[in-house]
Amino acid sequence: FIKTLSTTTTPEGTRIDSYTQTRNYYLKVDYTTPVGKGGSFEVGGKADFNNNVIPNSYFNLSNNDWVFDNTKSNNFKYSDNINALYANFSKTFFEKLETRIGLRYEYIRFKLRQDVGNIEKTTSYGRFLPNLLVKYSFNSNYDLSLTYNHNLWRPWYSEFNPFLMPNNDGIYTQGNMDLLPNPSDRVVLKFGLFKKYFISARYMFTDQDYWTNYKEEDGKMISFPDNFKGKVEKFYLFANTNQNFLKNKLNVNFGLGWYYIDNSDFNIRNGLSRDNNYISYIGGSTNLSYTNLFN
């Protein structure tokens, strides 16, 4: 959409102090046992507890002194409990074919609370997250692998914070207490040569995501993360190499890939421009590192 944005900046003489207080506790248990010839079974669990507070203190400049404004200040509190159980079974056949199948279940219960207005929300949900690996080694120099993962991306706790934060460009930012997690599926086919060169084809898709949206309230333009439905598919062809030189002192990593993204369903369902329904581009990356310890 097209929107004319105000260029009015936050008035001078306003100060906001915002920081985070974070506590994390967890308990993790893992157990692995061999199963037959070339097989193993792994099971485990983890209980994770998080407690986060974001105080937002608003001050006005009066007679060269900063005066605390209780009417605009706020404390945002986020706490969660994530419990996870997983099981993996791995087995190698005739010393060439490696397989692994796994299943993970995660259950999260989190609570959001804003002191101003005494706004409180509690949400819980559970998800199964399967994964699969099949890898065949033709010999010591060539191997082919196929992996599948179902993942879940959760919003960062600060993205739920509904406190209205002014920016210098005149636009305010605000969190969204109704954000949803973003599930995705990924399949990767990878061919390795001499343990130095790799060629991979990747496919990933998701049916929902959250992106920046805009709204206008009381003459203020506000940006906030919002939920968007719609399928996005991504296809990658990628080649990279990772090598060491000069007696392992110099490490070189170089990659080059072709990327294709299908946004057509996402754009149609959200009323966005169809000019970017299909995007393709070539991208590359390189990394050089040299280590010379006392030599």
Please report, for each region that a protein language model flagged, where it lies by residue:
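Primarily recognizes Gram-negative and organellar outer-membrane beta-barrels
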Residues: 1-193, 197-295
